[in-house]
Amino acid sequence: EIENIWNGLKPPYVDLIKWLKNQGKYPKVEISETFHTMMLANSINLKKDAVKINPNDYLAEYKWDGIRIQISCKNNNTKIFSRTGEDISHSFPEILINSKKLLVLDGELLAGKDFTPFPFGILQKRLNKKSPSKKLLISNPVFVRLYDILFYNELDIRDLSIIERKKFLEKFFLSISENKYFDLSKIIKFSDFKVLNNIYLNCSESNFIEGLMLKKKNSCYIAGRKK
């Protein structure tokens, strides 16, 4: 509960302390300023676990070698959070969204140009830079490969299936004009797990792919790691 409001609170955290002591109500914060706990994955062994699941119930995507981020925007104010909820907006000033209504996106921040990834080391040079120079922005460009969407035009869609959320994500993506920084994660088509395993084995580090993600088609967006 604290994680969900932390970024919207300011020192000396009077309301938070009162709530923790049961002396006040749960603090209210501007939702666009807050971090929403991300949905995390569990590792599986395709050979071992494939017999337990129906491939028709799942979609697959590549897991890229970047950093997982959440982007929140309202009233044209863009916030970028790391997987742990740290506000890293200042390190990536070029990643902006123009939206009056609340949008919350989930994706992978990658170093790269024209949506072609660069080595992770190039991205590392951008991390923890509070005021990156124009030279650094040019020499170490970045973009976001979008996986999911949590809020669309103020609407909380986390309870919808991933299939339905992907439709909203595509709608957002198509609404962006002159887009240089946002790309959609590719859906991998597969007929069975043998095919998917072959795709996995062909994942190349030279293409900056860490592996594959399986997502159940009817799954809603659940915070944390569900077992």
Where are these regions (language model features)?
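Glycine-rich, charged/polar anion/phosphate-binding loops
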Residues: 127-133, 198-200, 226-227
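Short, intrinsically disordered, charge-balanced linker/junction segments flanking boundaries
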Residues: 94-95, 223-227
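N-terminal nucleic-acid-engaging modules of covalent nucleotidyltransferase systems
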Residues: 1-192
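Metal-assisted phosphate- and nucleotidyl-transfer catalytic regions
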Residues: 174-225
